[in-house]
């Protein structure tokens, strides 16, 4: 070896086999070290969000230096110069520095990398949870779709049996069931009867006692209840399982407001009755009931209950409609019969009206002719009384016979000025013969403030007073009858039993108050509500005091037309009776000054009854058994 060469000899010979392997290994190590930084550079370029770029730069420098060290080491397997040794030393020193710095930086980076791993796991868990939630959402959507479909099918009809059949078929198709059945309560309510199935129709009619523990368990829960496949409720099909028995669930179906639910003599069901729906999965399938399937069954059971209640309401409506049609037909027939009866009655009344008016006109004509002759004062008074009675009888005949006019409310008042005091005088002249026959005293008292003239219907007013006073005389055997007339005070216009009567006091009008008091048989509290009814007779009236029973009823109608009020008061049987009525009359603007105002005075029953030359007259009561009262003239 040349002494002038500053070279370093290797530790092994160049042709040594180990040296060759090391040479080759260093070459490939250097090649790998130089390729790794290129891959890191490509990764950093593609990853725009990588947070540790400077760390990768340090790794790249470390790897490049390591590769350079191995590459320089290739020249050390042969004789090499000292320059190569210096370069190798510098490369190793730089590699040591960079590797130490990188190692120190990893102390701070590794915890962050661990956190990244934890976050990755957390995100995976969240992703799994989201997947589960999405599965639940998809399941709910599927359940909702099936429920919507089933609801549409159920509500497409309001026939109960169609609803139940459709429900079972659609549930069996949607849930892929081996069998689905419905148990309904029997007529006695002590058992459940199988009414509907999908496949095994031969089992329909089977009966299960309602007091079984499994039935009570289903009734006491509004959720799906799992029942054994050996339960009597599950005996809806033959057991064909060879390995795994089928899972069976049951749920109650409220029968809401069902009546007359007839199938195989089913009873009338109340709102607390329940049916039981049983659902069976296919056997040997190892399939279990999932939560969304249970939820679907619960929702469908509620929808079936609502649909059944709607169907029941429709059936009740149809039955009510049919009943109403039958009643309308019956009412129409009754209306036609009533119209025929009314026509016949009107014809009869028209004939009777004509036949009664003929003799009445003769009486009026003869009485008018008698007034034109020379009569005494007493005779003239009697003939005038006959004329007034005939006129009043004509009015009564018009009212009683023209029933249709009274019933349809077409009766109208004849408003005209009249002498109010003379009206009471005429009433006394009409009732005093009957009172004299029964030896009753009649007292008439007119208040000083009572006007002489008034405006109203004199005939109706006179008829009211005659009906009330005549009624008092009729039911009084002994004693007296008093008639008092005055102007009513506004606070006294409402009777004790008429809270809805509201009189209206206005200028130009006044209310006439008339009180008729007797000492007769009185009225019992039981008969008081019936006194103003047509053809009503008190039980204590007796057979001699029975009239037509129209007087008070007509009087009440006339008082109502005159915007008044009428009522009776009695302390009981045998204690007399007091009749009070108010009528609204007009006040004349210019009363006749030539007429003298009548002062209140008592009238005796025999006043004007006739003197020794009185004309023979007769006053007839409505009862034909009452004897006639005659006043004979002297011969």
From Swiss-Prot:
Annotated family: Belongs to the ethylene receptor family.
The transmembrane residues are 24-44, 59-79, 94-114
The cofactor note reads:
Binds 1 copper ion per dimer.
Per UniProt, the keywords (alphabetical) are: ATP-binding, Copper, Disulfide bond, Endoplasmic reticulum, Ethylene signaling pathway, Kinase, Membrane, Metal-binding, Nucleotide-binding, Phosphoprotein, Receptor, Transferase, Transmembrane, Transmembrane helix, Two-component regulatory system
Q: A GO molecular-function term, please?
A: phosphorelay sensor kinase activity
Its chief place of residence is endoplasmic reticulum
Q: How does it sit in the membrane?
A: Multi-pass membrane protein
Q: What is its EC number?
A: 2.7.13.3
Say if the entry is tagged with keyword Nucleotide-binding: yes
Name the InterPro entries for this protein: GAF (IPR003018), GAF-like_dom_sf (IPR029016), HATPase_C_sf (IPR036890), His_kinase_dom (IPR005467), HisK_dim/P_dom (IPR003661), HisK_dim/P_sf (IPR036097), Sig_transdc_His_kin-like_C (IPR004358)
Gene3D superfamilies to which the protein is assigned, alphabetical: 1.10.287.130, 3.30.450.40, Histidine kinase-like ATPase, C-terminal domain
| Cofactor(s) essential for the protein | Cu cation
What organism is listed for this UniProt entry? Answer: Oryza sativa subsp. japonica (Rice)
| Catalytic class of the enzyme | transferase
Q: What name goes with this protein?
A: Probable ethylene response sensor 2
Q: Which CDD domains match?
A: HisKA
Q: Which residues are in the GAF domain?
A: 159-308
At which positions is Cu cation bound?
Answer: 66, 70
Domain Histidine kinase positions: 351-589
- Describe the protein's quaternary organization and the partners it interacts with: Homodimer.
Provide the phenotype resulting from gene inactivation. Chlorina phenotype. Enhanced ethylene sensitivity.
Q: Which residues are recorded as modified (Phosphohistidine)?
A: 354
